[in-house]
Amino acid sequence: MVPWLGPDDPFPSIERALGPATGAPGLLAASADLLPSRLIDAYLRGIFPWYSDGQPVLWWSPDPRMILVPAEFKVSPSLRKTLKRVLRAPEWEVRVDHDFAGVMRACAQAPRRGQRGTWITAEIIDAYTSLYRSGNAHSIETWHDGRRVGGLYGVSFGRMFFGESMYADVTDASKIALAALIAHLREQRLEMIDCQQNTSHLASLGGREIARKAFVAHVRSAVAEPPIPWQFDKRVLAALTSPAETAAPTGTER
């Protein structure tokens, strides 16, 4: 039985999350609220919300957990070529936190293979925008000729980044944003990005699964560290244009 959380109820132990033999592995709890304080507490514990319109707020802590280590990020030859073109052409920009809510809305509207509707509800946008205003959520955006054409957003505490979603209106725009994020996190020596769930797209970029226990232990340590800076631009991409970076073809995105 999944516990129902009242406004003042704490999260249960993550070990109580539903197991792989259930229809919802990783489901930990449900609630009616998505208050910023609840959301912050969730991330600090390695828990995240994921639900659809008409459902209660569902809280998850899957085992294993999909992560991406910035040092293990793989760049395909075609993406490397794209990054070089972006670096050369002044009409391409990478902006940070320029239009956070706009990136979230674009992610909500992006079609996803095998999905109907979106889990990025108006309530989710309001809650994460509150985190953005407090400096704990960020958007990495790809711009071309003065128009935002792709990007991603996520949550950051200390030296931990929790990826949420990405979108692209033009080919490779989301990958450019992700590459810029990876390059920046490498510079900051950040060790792990939370990717929540396993997808072929993430795996092709170097993502892998680790045990929930190891993930939560890392989160507890990383979020206690001082926060990293969040000012950078497309020049960070130069670090990813070496032929040493390789990857398999990519699949779908979350």
Curated annotation (Swiss-Prot):
Q: What is its EC number?
A: 2.3.2.6
In alphabetical order, the GO MF annotations are: leucyl-tRNA--protein transferase activity
Record's GO cellular component, any one?
Answer: cytoplasm
Q: Which reaction does it catalyse?
A: N-terminal L-lysyl-[protein] + L-leucyl-tRNA(Leu) = N-terminal L-leucyl-L-lysyl-[protein] + tRNA(Leu) + H(+); N-terminal L-arginyl-[protein] + L-leucyl-tRNA(Leu) = N-terminal L-leucyl-L-arginyl-[protein] + tRNA(Leu) + H(+); L-phenylalanyl-tRNA(Phe) + an N-terminal L-alpha-aminoacyl-[protein] = an N-terminal L-phenylalanyl-L-alpha-aminoacyl-[protein] + tRNA(Phe)
Q: Where in the cell is it found?
A: Cytoplasm
Described function: Functions in the N-end rule pathway of protein degradation where it conjugates Leu, Phe and, less efficiently, Met from aminoacyl-tRNAs to the N-termini of proteins containing an N-terminal arginine or lysine.
Q: Which family does it belong to?
A: Belongs to the L/F-transferase family.
Listed NCBIfam families: aat
Protein name, per record: Leucyl/phenylalanyl-tRNA--protein transferase
